[in-house]
């Protein structure tokens, strides 16, 4: 979360992919549903969904937004939280900021490049920023 980047690194330590992200609006480690924090730690990919038809209401008065998750939703196995994942967006201007309800958000084009590199049960590590550590 410090650099607002997602990186795919192979077992030799070679970086295969990097892209800018948006993460949880609030600093710190996810504690409960609705806290707007991105979980920190070591997780696994539990599923990869086609999310093109999914909708989400951001409670901003605009109602349900089709395509809010972009073309794919990479679901993470996060104990106590069933809706955390890595996904695309309908709002690429949010990237590089803390704007999500807890997920990791990418540009749809970057997500399309990431998908061939991801498989179940791949390991995902989410590291805190210095400010996240202060808030924990």
Language-model region placement:
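Exported/periplasmic cell-wall-interacting domains
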Residues: 32-35, 51-136
């Amino acid at each position: 979360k410090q650099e607002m980047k997602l990186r795919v690194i192979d077992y030799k330590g070679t970086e295969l992919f990097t892209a800018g992200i948006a993460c949880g609006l609030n600093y710190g480690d996810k504690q409960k549903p609705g806290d707007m924090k991105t979980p920190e730690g070591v997780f696994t990919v539990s599923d990869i969904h086609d999310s093109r038809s999914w909708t989400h209401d951001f409670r901003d008065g605009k109602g349900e937004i089709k395509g809010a998750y972009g073309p794919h939703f990479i679901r993470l196995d996060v104990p106590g939280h069933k809706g955390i994942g890595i996904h695309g967006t309908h709002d690429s201007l949010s990237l590089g900021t803390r704007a999500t309800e807890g997920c990791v958000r990418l540009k749809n084009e970057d997500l399309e490049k990431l998908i061939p590199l991801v498989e179940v049960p791949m390991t995902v590590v989410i590291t805190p920023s210095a400010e996240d550590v202060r808030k924990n």
